[in-house]
């Protein structure tokens, strides 16, 4: 029987002093106290040990350990002592008498403690007066790390503020049995136990990377006990079906100390196989030595294609319409970053969530309260897990309303708020604040300074593509392809999997007849077959069966989807469970329920029809997918006399199609998930261009084909001074390439970073924002929703003007330009009869989208909530961009993606008083950042509504190109030679060698 914890009931015999307000003197105890009952950083031993803390006396003999990495020289006052949050071995189970703890520690204990701290990449912090240990911090150049408030942070753990974690379980089962295996500390266990992810922590300094810690979820998922896990390598999960090639990749990753994310077939203790999405992340010290590995597992058997991943259609394209592995890897990579941060800084979790752990009621009552704060902002969530809840898993959905009972699925696939859940779009008075930026938690989120936060910042600035509109339709439906034998399923929604209990691997490539059973009416089935043969739609009710044999009444609607020629591409099958509305006597669904259900499934089918048209036809050949990239690009009217076009025209006049051989690599400009951008020179000229090269295989595997095709189509439409021109596009055997303008000024993001305070003055913000407004106006007029406005995508031209770039996340729809006649009051009519009223030009994209794309910090609320979005998302992003130019950071940024999304939906907009800004610019940003898109500036009259705001007073919109750029503290071109020594890009040379 596993022992249980027994909290101590013996009260303390000594009373701690209190200050003038009656608060406990915790941080400054009286000098009369020789020592506290529970010394700082000395947690009580777990109840399962039933012995005193041996570290209160001379240290016990320990087995010889591997040498720890060398540490920088510390000051004399930084005395190394063993702290409670290091990886410690089990003390020998013998009775040890308690002795008075003094400041003096044996040298061996000090050396051992410092070694253990070094293995975690940490340093010990001591009190400058007494030399007593005061905490452990991340190693930095200064050698110490203090609390932002100038105080030494302390934390004390007792039996009252924690519960039994999986780490305690694992350690309890091996009491000293594996003395050679270091165990994670109590504080680290406490931090890790707050996460709901399934993961293990392995020791990279030991041979074979033994497991030091396993979460409770790992034991539940695999069926193994802690005694069978701790101290072993994870290979016990492997079996006959585990891919050897994938295992070789994992071994190479571990040897190199790199990250890994992949799906492998593993086996539980009872022999059951399951698909495991494994993400490995290394924990390194400041010298780059790998100390630990975190291995996060997610069982994805329900949603993955599994063995069907490599299944191909006769045309060579994947059998599945969507590649789900790419979706799952994106979410897993983001989720594991939280675990990495917890292992690197175990205390950071409790410090960030429990801002005032020792505050008494009397103290909290005296704190000034903000009248405009929301109730949700006044509550600091607990960082420790308790019976009532816990830290939110980053892969769970965001909910503004109380959550319903979670589904049994092991993976919440979307990881976001469902469309069906209500979103409070009202703007209350507390949404905007003009006070001091004194929220410590917010300040930590908004201004990260540590190395880890900088890594997180780099990740959060990348564009994300989490789901297409099709994937976000949360109804029970499948899509089949009648052009293939037996009309197989090529797409199944997550909701359909939940309803039928089948996994995606089990149904892809199969006909829907597997839902039939003993009581399924064959006459009704014949109606469906006739509709398929005749390519017509039909709506029926029939009994179907789940995988477990449970029957349900299905209101089923079949609808063909036709292409522009009128030929059937797909069949859409929508199911609705009507079992709750069955009349017991007649054993049929109630008539009113049937009518409502039929209307719902038909409406859903229409939405699916529109959504699936965003994707390329699955019956295309791979050559057809990239055919547009081989077309000749024709010159646009406003660019025909420019030097770049004249140079391109000379090549075209020779009759030879432009290809990779016409360009010479100069240097790389950047890289992303699907490709890279290079500076190239047209051979035989001095004309420079930017070439974007995208890997075809990566585009297919990451569901990016339709994005790349849309970007090529969008670039071919553009003819505007604040947007790039497309000069050529071509393909090689492995890549597709786009040739566009090169802008020597670089990114607005880097321009901001070069400024002394990382911000721009208000006149500069006005200049760049005005040009962005004009560029967005043109895009919207062309029916383009940009969807990825951020400083990285605002490039600076040679003359100082801006140009938007990167349209792979943009949406191309239709647009209907309108002329709006302003309404005039009757009293003013007579006065204005002589002057003709100027009509307002408005052109906004007509069709809404619901795909989950954008950049984390710039995504609008309606994208997160799944309510569907229009071009209003670009005006939201403009508000975020202006805020970042003014203050140097975005207003809703969080330490995790989930926190950022929560902030976007809930957090108040605040303008810090540390940087002066006019009322006009604050009002403009506030109106652009309305959570309800119907109330957002630009919704009614488009760009004209934004132009008319008082912040832009004095802007001559017709002659905006003639406006001189503002003077900056650090100029755009700082005198460095633009055409310096040219560096040949090996990657592009290799690409050139493999030209088609």
From Swiss-Prot:
> Where is the sequence biased in composition, kind Acidic residues?
434-443
Which residue ranges does the record assign to the PAC domain? 258-312, 536-590
- What happens when you mutate residue 512 to A? Loss of light-sensing and light-dependent autophosphorylation
Topology in the lipid bilayer is annotated as:
Peripheral membrane protein
Residues that hold ATP according to the record = 669-677, 692
Where does it reside?
A: Cell membrane; Cytoplasm
How does inactivating the gene affect the organism? Answer: Enhanced drought tolerance, when associated with PHOT2 disruption. Plants lacking both PHOT1 and PHOT2 have curled downward leaves missing color changes and lower petiole angles in response to weak or strong blue light (BL). Impaired proton H(+) pumping associated with altered increased ATP hydrolysis and absence of binding between 14-3-3 protein and H(+)-ATPase (e.g. AHA1 and AHA2) in response to BL in guard cells of plants missing PHOT1 and PHOT2.
Q: Which GO terms describe its molecular function?
A: ATP binding; blue light photoreceptor activity; FMN binding; identical protein binding; kinase activity; mRNA binding; protein kinase activity; protein serine kinase activity
Q: Which residues form the signal peptide?
A: none
Q: Where is this region: Activation loop?
A: 806-862
Q: Which residues form the active site?
A: 788 (proton acceptor)
Task: Report, as the record phrases it, the tissue specificity of this protein.
Answer: Present in guard cells (at protein level).
UniProt's post-translational modification comment states: Autophosphorylated at Ser-185, Ser-350 and Ser-410 in response to blue light irradiation. 2 molecules of FMN bind covalently to cysteines after exposure to blue light and are reversed in the dark.
Q: Which domain of life is it from?
A: Eukaryota
Q: Which residues carry this modification: Phosphoserine?
A: 23, 58, 185, 350, 376, 410, 450
InterPro entries reported for this sequence: Kinase-like_dom_sf, PAC, PAS, PAS-assoc_C, PAS-like_dom_sf, Prot_kinase_dom, Protein_kinase_ATP_BS, Ser/Thr_kinase_AS
Give residues annotated as binding FMN 1: 233, 235, 238, 251, 266, 276, 297, 302
Q: Which residues carry this modification: S-4a-FMN cysteine?
A: 234, 512
Q: Which UniProt keywords apply?
A: ATP-binding, Cell membrane, Chromophore, Cytoplasm, Disulfide bond, Flavoprotein, FMN, Kinase, Membrane, Nucleotide-binding, Phosphoprotein, Photoreceptor protein, Receptor, Repeat, Sensory transduction, Serine/threonine-protein kinase, Transferase
Protein kinase domain location? 663-952
- Family in the record: Belongs to the protein kinase superfamily. AGC Ser/Thr protein kinase family.
Q: How does it assemble?
A: Homodimer; disulfide-linked. Interacts with PKS1, PKS2, RPT2, RPT3, PHOT2 and BLUS1. Subunit of a complex made of CAR6, PHOT1 and RPT3/NPH3. Associates with CBC1 and CBC2. Binds to BHP.
Q: What job does the chain carry out? A: Protein kinase that acts as a blue light (BL) photoreceptor in a signal-transduction pathway for photo-induced movements. Triggers the phosphorylation of AHA1 and AHA2 C-terminal penultimate Thr in guard cells to activate them and induce stomatal opening in response to blue light (BL). Also phosphorylates BLUS1, a kinase involved in stomatal opening. Mediates the phosphorylation of CBC1 in stomata, but not of CBC2, in response to blue light. Required for blue light mediated mRNA destabilization. Mediates calcium spiking of extracellular origin in response to a low rate of blue light.
- Miscellaneous comment as given in the Swiss-Prot or TrEMBL entry: Undergoes a photocycle characterized by fluorescence and absorption changes induced by blue light. Half-time of photoproduct formation is 14 seconds and 70 seconds for dark regeneration.
Q: What is this protein called?
A: Phototropin-1
